């Protein structure tokens, strides 16, 4: 018989099905690891490529493997080494070859050309300094690589003595700065934090011509200050490193992010001027959990030309989006989380007004750079709050400002995209003409916000095509097009939009990763699964889509939309055949499958249509090979059987074969692929709230045919029919069981006993009939020997 559902073991069949599911249903991995529902691109700010790393993310830390800026994700430049070599080149006045310099500094100074160079200038101090640093580096590397047995531990006291002596000999600021840095570092690593701070103040501050090395030393001072509890000064010092040090800015941010969770306001007293104050507020503004609006307000007041201002504002907009919009997978939240989310949404709704007020003020502030950012941000927040006229007004102002910022250009385009779909009362050719070019430009979106915009705009316009006045926050579990007439249609919308349902469907297809992603960028979390939508779409909808593709007089929009989706006749008619099979319209299924190229049935997907669709075995793994049918010939056979049964309702053999064929296209059948793209043993469960009351899962249609066949005068055929009906009951029970959960006060044993009562009372009628009335048939005896479920049932009796 067909196997009982196994959810924790992989049988031969489940391995095969898993392979199909992976092949057909899984797209490439998510392109962005921290996606959320957002439409405002932070790239629209004037932040430098280096600062773009600090765009808002829901995560606590950034992905350090992506490089310093999003514009250079593959940049693996060792900034520390680069800075250092440039400094040494300047110190040597360019009189030694770069490769010799690098070997002497990052290899070994002993017997190197760099050593000879320094000797020629009587610079023994430089040689001694490099010998010390290279030995320290060698030991540190060995310890990190767990090679401690092969090296001697450094003696901090001895190192401090050596560095102090070297410092006394230093006359040039270049070497003095480096030796002082090593001294501060050694004190800090030895946990002599007060001495580290003192060494910095005594030796680094007096250096007139400071380089990046002073900022490296400042990092060590700040770390020591944290250990001493001086968080305010440490925060200030980290902010200076963040602004000035190309190589250590990320480290400064991470340590402050991890060690100082709140902004110490006392840090402001260490700032020497307005620029430093603004930089301090910027450093605070990029931290999670910090209210950035007061920070950016201060920055505008103190230093309106600061390049972090727009970035901080973009962060606040993105942060508020995170709380304002329903985020992906919100349906899995528990009740307590839902309450928290609701409160956050209420706060975010109020916060939009504050952000918008500040943004509009900045749009009119002549002291700020005229980039178009503030007009664009104001337009977006007017859109969020539903004032589309004002949004258009601000967006037009933004368009009038010349910019070379591609991120800002894309944001303006994105907002225009949203506005077209949202503000349009009805669908007209003019609306379609305006919508299409932007839709085409967002094809294969390059970031998740573009993907979100495609989803939102297509969803809104799709709803209007269907005559739905409002857009639901979540789709029905039956799919967007499983019932296109479940709401009262707006005749004005439909009257102005020929092929409205077909257009709505195709727009939905553009929200899927199969149709709107690429190998380069992968798919996004907001994108839908085309196969799941197709598997829940009505036959009537697909017929409308085919009629739309067959239209002779196509508009530019029609041609463009159909080209973007890219469906050919094979795809459309295969889908129509599947949906007809799902609705047991075998004549239309045959009609559709006949129009599919025979080569399609030879593709990898259809190699799994390899078991006889008109045969139901009594024992698992006793399936017959499919030697006679492809989808077209099988659908044709089913249509013929149905016609014979209609002509003669007493034709039990036709009823039985029709029942077998119908059963095999259900969830537990061997030919489910004639209805669905994919199959999973975990598809039915209690947590995803799927739509399981369909014939695909409940097998009602097959059971009806089996019962009709059971009226045969042939006892063996009748026994077969009742066994088939019993399988339908069993499958329905499995679906019911897998949706249930134990009550809080129930043990697993009590829960299973309760479920067993349900099975016995509601889902075992036909096993009972087979046992009580047909136990003398050969077929019943065969079933008793071979069918595990029936044997269990008999054991209970």
Where are these regions (language model features)?
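N-terminal secretory signal peptides that target proteins for export/translocation
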Residues: 1-11
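Generic alpha-helix initiation/capping and coil-helix boundary signal
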Residues: 12-15, 714
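Bacterial N-terminal signal peptides
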Residues: 14-25
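Extracytoplasmic/secretory-pathway proteins
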Residues: 26-185, 190-797
């Amino acid at each position: 018989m067909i196997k009982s559902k196994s959810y924790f073991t992989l049988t031969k069949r489940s391995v095969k099905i898993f392979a199909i599911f992976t092949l057909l249903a899984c797209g490439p991995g998510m392109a962005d690891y921290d996606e959320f529902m957002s439409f405002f691109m932070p790239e629209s700010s004037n932040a430098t490529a280096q600062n773009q790393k600090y765009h808002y993310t829901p995560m606590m830390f950034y992905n350090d493997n992506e490089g310093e800026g999003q514009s250079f994700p593959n940049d693996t430049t060792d900034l520390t080494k680069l800075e250092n070599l440039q400094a040494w080149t300047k110190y040597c006045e360019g009189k030694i070859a770069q490769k010799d310099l690098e070997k002497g500094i990052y290899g070994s100074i002993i017997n190197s050309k760099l050593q000879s160079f320094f000797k020629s200038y009587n610079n023994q101090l430089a040689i001694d300094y490099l010998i010390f640093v290279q030995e320290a580096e060698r030991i540190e590397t060995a310890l990190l690589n767990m090679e401690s047995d092969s090296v001697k531990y450094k003696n901090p006291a001895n190192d401090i003595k050596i560095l102090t002596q070297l410092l006394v000999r230093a006359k040039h600021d270049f070497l003095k700065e480096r030796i002082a840095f090593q001294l501060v570092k050694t004190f800090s690593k030895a946990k002599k934090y007060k001495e580290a701070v003192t060494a910095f103040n005594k030796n680094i501050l007096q250096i007139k011509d400071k380089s990046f090395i002073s900022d490296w030393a400042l990092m060590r001072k700040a770390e020591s200050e944290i250990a001493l509890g001086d968080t305010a000064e440490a925060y200030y010092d980290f902010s200076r490193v963040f602004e000035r040090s190309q190589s250590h800015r990320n480290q400064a941010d991470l340590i402050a992010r991890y060690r100082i969770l709140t902004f110490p306001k006392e840090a402001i007293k260490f700032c020497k001027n307005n620029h430093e104050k603004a930089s301090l507020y910027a450093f605070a503004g990029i931290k999670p959990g910090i209210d950035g609006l007061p920070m950016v307000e201060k920055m505008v007041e103190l230093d309106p030309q600061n390049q972090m201002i727009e970035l901080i504002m973009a962060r606040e907009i993105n942060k508020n989006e995170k709380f304002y919009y329903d985020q992906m997978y919100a349906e899995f939240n528990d009740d307590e989380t839902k309450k928290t989310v609701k409160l956050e949404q209420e706060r975010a709704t109020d916060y939009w007004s504050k952000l918008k007020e500040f943004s509009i003020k900045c749009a009119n502030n002549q002291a700020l750079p005229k980039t178009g950012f503030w007009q664009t941000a104001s337009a977006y927040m007017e859109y969020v709050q539903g004032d589309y006229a004002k949004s258009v007004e601000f967006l037009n102002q933004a368009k009038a400002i010349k910019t070379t910022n591609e991120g800002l250009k894309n944001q303006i385009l994105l907002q225009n995209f949203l506005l077209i779909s949202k503000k349009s009362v009805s669908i007209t050719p003019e609306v379609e003409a305006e919508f299409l070019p932007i839709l085409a430009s967002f094809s294969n979106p390059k970031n998740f916000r573009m993907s979100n915009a495609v989803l939102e705009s297509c969803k809104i316009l799709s709803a209007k095509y269907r005559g739905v006045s409002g857009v639901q926050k979540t789709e029905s579990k039956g799919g967007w097009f499983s019932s296109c007439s479940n709401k009262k249609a707006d005749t004005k919308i439909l009257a102005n939009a020929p092929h409205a349902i077909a257009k709505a469907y195709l727009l939905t297809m553009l929200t899927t990763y199969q149709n709107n992603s690429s190998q380069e960028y992968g798919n996004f979390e907001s994108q839908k699964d085309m196969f799941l939508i197709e598997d829940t779409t009505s036959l009537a909808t697909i017929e409308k889509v085919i009629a739309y593709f067959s239209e002779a007089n196509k508009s530019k929009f029609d041609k463009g939309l159909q080209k973007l989706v890219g469906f050919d006749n094979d795809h459309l008619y295969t889908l129509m055949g599947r949906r007809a099979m799902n609705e047991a319209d075998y004549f239309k299924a045959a009609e559709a499958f006949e129009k599919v190229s025979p080569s399609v049935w030879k593709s990898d997907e259809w190699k799994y249509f390899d078991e006889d669709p008109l045969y139901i075995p009594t024992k698992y793994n006793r399936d017959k090979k499919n030697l006679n049918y492809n989808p077209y010939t099988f659908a044709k056979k089913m249509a013929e059987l149905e016609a014979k049964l209609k002509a003669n309702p007493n034709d039990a053999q036709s009823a039985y074969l029709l029942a077998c064929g119908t059963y095999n296209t259900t969830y537990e059948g061997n030919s489910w692929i004639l209805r669905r793209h994919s199959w999973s043993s975990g598809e039915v469960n209690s947590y995803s709230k799927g739509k399981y009351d369909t014939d695909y899962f409940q097998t009602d249609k097959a059971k009806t045919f089996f019962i009709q066949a059971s009226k045969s005068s042939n006892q063996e055929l009748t026994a077969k029919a009742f066994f088939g009906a019993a399988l339908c009951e069993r499958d329905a029970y499995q679906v019911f069981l897998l949706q249930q959960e134990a009550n809080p006060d129930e043990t697993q044993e009590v829960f299973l006993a309760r479920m067993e009562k349900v099975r016995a009372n509601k889902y075992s009628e036909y096993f009972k009939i087979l046992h009580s009335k047909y136990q003398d048939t050969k077929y019943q005896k065969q079933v008793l020997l071979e069918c595990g479920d029936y044997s269990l049932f008999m054991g209970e009796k």
